[in-house]
């Protein structure tokens, strides 16, 4: 199974320079960041995968530098705040401010997918970065495919356990499979 995923490692085969850079230096960055050891000591994660996702959210917050972070999952807030100190944590259902840079983190196991599609996605724009957790379950995979081909979304990255969605319509719509 691991050998089948090898072709999706470290940005191999990605032609877009910006997508390659994002995959290589944000998603699959392996160098230890300044806050990793402190976060490990202060906040205990229930599983190794959740710790890995916390590190990913740290790197995404560091890359995107959002002014606001919207989520209902509080487990990852310390990682997001460590990645971007200026970011303010807000309730997911208060996502109506499209003038600021936003990071939206959603766990598909803890949210109504139809409500997400009808109530939250219309407020996402090019200043929004959406992170979708819990993709590796049957119905969640179906929703992810629906989300990828939605008129709202732009470039998407499927990391098997999580998905990342950009809403910039000025770029050609692409879907990348990334071994995370």
Report the location of each language-model feature:
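A short alpha-helical cap/connector motif
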Residues: 1-125, 136-180
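Glycine-centered, small-residue-biased loops immediately flanking beta-strands
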Residues: 128
